[in-house]
Amino acid sequence: MKETTITKPLGTTVHLHRYRLRRLEPSQFFLFGAGLVVLFLTICAIAPQWVAPYAPTMIDPTNLLQPPSASHLFGTDYFGRDVFTLVVYGSRDSLLIGLASVVVGGVLGGVLGAISGYVGGLVDLIIMRFIEVLMTIPGILLALAIAAALGPSTLNIILAIASGTIPRYARVMRSSILTVKHRSYVLASRSIGSSEFRIFWRHVLPNSTAPFLVMATIGIGTSILTGSGLSFLGLGVIKEIPDWGTVLSQGRGYLTVAWWVCTFPGLAIALFVLSVNVIGDRIRDVLDPKKSNGSFTGGS
Amino acid sequence: MKIERSNKWINHTALSLMTAALLAGCGSNQVQSPNPSAPADQTAASAGNEQGGELTYALATSPDTLDAGASGFAVSHRVFRNIFDSLVFQAKEGTFQPWLASSWTKSEDGKEYTFKLRTDVTFQDGTPFNAAAVKANFDHIFAAGRGQSRSLLGTFSSAEVVDEHTIKIILSEPFEPLLAGLGSGFLGISSPKAFEQYGDQYGKHPVGTGPFKFVSWTENDQIVLEKNPDYKWGPPGADNKGPSQLDKITFKIIPEEATRIGSVQSGQVLVAETVPPQLITALNNDPNIAVDQSITNGTAFSLYINTKNEPWNEIKARQAVQLAVDVDTIVQTLYLGTYERAWSALTPGILGYDSSLENKVKPDIAKANQLLDELGWKQGGDGIREKDGQKLILRYLDGSPNREKRNDIAAIVQQQLKQIGVQVNLNITKDTNTPITNGEYDIFGNSQVKADPDILRNLLRSDKVFTKGGTNWSNVADPEIDELLDQGASESDPQKRKEIYAQIQQYMIDRAIILPIYVFPYTVAHSKKVEGLKFDLLGYPLLYDVTIRK
Amino acid sequence: MTGTIATRLLTSLLVVIGSSMLVFVIMFVLPGDPVLQMLDGNATTPEAIEQMRQQLGLDQPFYVQFMQYFLQLLQGDFGASRIDSTPVLPKILAHVPATLALTAVSAAVSVLVGTILGVLSAIHRNGIIDLTARFVGLFGISMPTFWTGILLLLLFSIHLGLFPIAGSDGWKTLVLPGITLGLVGAGFIVRMVRNTMLEVISEPFIVTLRSKGLTERVVMYKHALRNALIPALTMMGVMVGELLSGTVVVETVFARQGIGRILADAIMSKDMPVVQGVVFFTAIIYVLVNLLVDVSYSFVDPRIRRSQ
């Protein structure tokens, strides 16, 4: 049962790929599929009521743990709720957690990295030592500590996840800035007397964002995964309308008796993260085909 | 190697299965079978049992300490019941029988208990068991002072060594639950020499007089016990009196449910505790596995309404909640018929349980709405009631992780109360202590395990609020109830005690202070090779009589 | 070169000290009363709570606590757990081997699976093999680890009975957790190795080698792969942190011993000495691995060795 659901998307991919081989390169097809998934789930997150057939809070004791059928595409859970509806509504908080923690972590890390890289000297030394220290602390420690101390709320979960990602954004940003800083156009701009701020804002920053953007895109997926890990450890937010991570972790005890309860939310997470990764990969190739590994090797 | 063994085991069980099937006659699977191994089956099978073997027992959580006097957790009790014996033995019917104490007397005023101790008992480290040793245990409890032990001793004032094998316990006030406390594993007797030897590390090196000796404890992994070969003072409830049939018990700590239950299904452990309801049916269909359920006693899992916070200080508001929550639906939906619904604060197996409360409260949405209308809470635009610009909010506090599906109860209650215009704000968190200390909750769920109805004292007496060390979640402060609780503790006539506790239980329901939800059955899945697994009055497992069929 | 290593060791030491100081500050600043946490349902009187606070020195101001902690640390004294009063050092040392074994196996799985898939993917660029390899690689990083773990466990331990389910005795208990955690790293390495391979293949020296008449296999595996391994190695250094984080979840799913679980428990109960101790060790592991990675560059790529 599990096997079929997991291989299904792969199977379809292969099949379609053969069908369109002459027109579409495989990686483009990949990208196309990923785009569709992200688009669909974004629509779900913005307007779940358009997509979901039922109300997410509808508890129906007469309809517990029903396998997938025509009326319940993904079956029903242990409350008798429609699993498809849960997946659709769950996208809202999951995507929010993913995006917001990237924004928080990315802004903090990006600013630190940019300052460090551009100003250089003692400032760079201090910030980078700090980042290095931060990197030795397992991300989960910060996440656990913050989530446990601040208590469960979506905002706190976002902060918790974001905290662990600061160093990697800082390092990526710094290393890109370092490469761009000494490029001829920057030197040229300085020689004609542009202000430092203008140079940074107009020349350095725009040319350093590529690896950072790639990392941020992929970070959306990683954050969702970290969030579901927190749910698993009992630190997630339990709300009326749960996010995917919560549905997955609360439903995992039913795996052997009603596989559909958590398989579909699990697939939703996997598909979404997968798609985001595919898109991130693609952005990397398009923006910066030469330095495609810079984002991970960057740093001191 | 392990795989090989389990293969052999499958061959063996295939044979024994056929025998079992013949014995069982009709192969109907009952979901709720408190003790599926019928006595006839047991005697027939135990003929083929051999001495020895290792019992592996998967626990869901880890004990905090194995110092009986310092722990408050049920899981610790499950382990150290094998290491420690108690002065008295409480049978399933609630009566008391001699164990380490061969006899006892109670003074006229109920303030002095004199125990004659057995003279042939030694601790596992060779220290003789005597009155001084027992006294050392009380000293230890009042010096270290954590866990359940102190509250079980109630009004204990001092212990006096009368002679080598006689000890007198002196109470400041009569305290009827004393014997029940002394029968508990939390007041199991430790070796005084071990206290001295290990100091504050005693909890990792327990030494008692029980049928199993402590060998090792690897944190987050396992606790190993081995047979005490000199044991010959088995409790009255056991079939065995001498050394255990088992060579070794290994408690494995496996927190993840799927892993724990999977390990008993695949034969890697023999017993796994805390089987979730949805798996019971599946496991019952497994020919190699039996599921045992044992009702725990004490208080049922109930939702305690905080009567201190507005608007829930109003009895009508609480009654509206009481009438709107459909407990039958909750219990049916979540536990699929494997848990019994509760009607009172106390569990049915405890002295004084008031069965007249059964079926007394029935869901009635119309009445609930009417009560809220009477209080002036008007339906707002979004379906939530309002009064003076304030929304009708119930803050529901519950602990994480989702133990016994309690978080799911919260989710259903949230939906049910929405029907009467109450907005339930869930606060499901690891750290429940902080919101409780700050009074930031309107409803909180809890259950406790204890053998005596005096358990209600800690839940209801006005001085037992949380910040003063009690568990009066509802913040009940009623002099009459205080008076009744005191009477209940000091009254020695069981009939009168029953009446007192019936009054208290009725008070809790009539005033809508609590919503009793379910009675927790401690559920274990075990290989059918394991025989003689029993449970005590409180639902704790007794492993002394266990044998493993080869 | 020894001089460089000595400097690196020294800065590493400073980093480790810095990280435990930072954690001290973080844990101190975050709300939550450690004493209340310690009670864990065993309610006691306010007097007892106050007494406990004094015993632990928690009534002292921040700088006093910090200095005390720091001085103890310099003397190699990690203190004792506030929950069960076991000394921290032996407690952690008992759990370090299990976590190290898990991390090592996961890292090996990551590198092995990641490199194989990455190379295949680069050689068969844009073909069906490339597609599949990348898909598999991406899938590894797209599933929550607890979910992968439970699925593997149900399939291989319960249904097929190939591996023991729980525990930390013997190599067999390492297989499934190692794969679970290793797949995450593999996903990153696939991408890395593929991209570098593609870059290397287009470089002049490969063209030269080809034109010299070397077989494609020798060119690819002896020369191109060697160059492609460097980023994978660097990746390993960064990934150690991720892997150590991952152990928290994986150790719980597979009921393994390890510092991941110790850490999670300690954080949730605000057991500061234990948190500090674990962080100290993870920091050392992290720093050492990165040091090793740097040193091993020179073996993989002779150019780096010469430039030093």
State where each predicted segment sits:
Chain B
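Surface-exposed binding/hinge segments that line
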Residues: 151-194, 200-201, 211-218
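N-terminal lobe/hinge region of extracytoplasmic solute-binding protein
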Residues: 58-108, 139, 538
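Ligand/substrate-recognition segments at binding pockets and active sites
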Residues: 378-450, 522
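Ligand-site clamp/hinge motif
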Residues: 231-282, 410, 423
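Aromatic- and charge-enriched surface segment that lines or borders ligand/interaction sites
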Residues: 102-147, 162, 168, 311-313
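A bilobed periplasmic-binding-protein/Venus flytrap-type ligand-binding module shared by bacterial periplasmic
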Residues: 90-91, 226-230, 298-320, 324, ...
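Detector for C-terminal structural segments
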Residues: 23, 218, 222-223, 324-355, ...
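Structural transition elements
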Residues: 212, 306, 341-381, 400-406
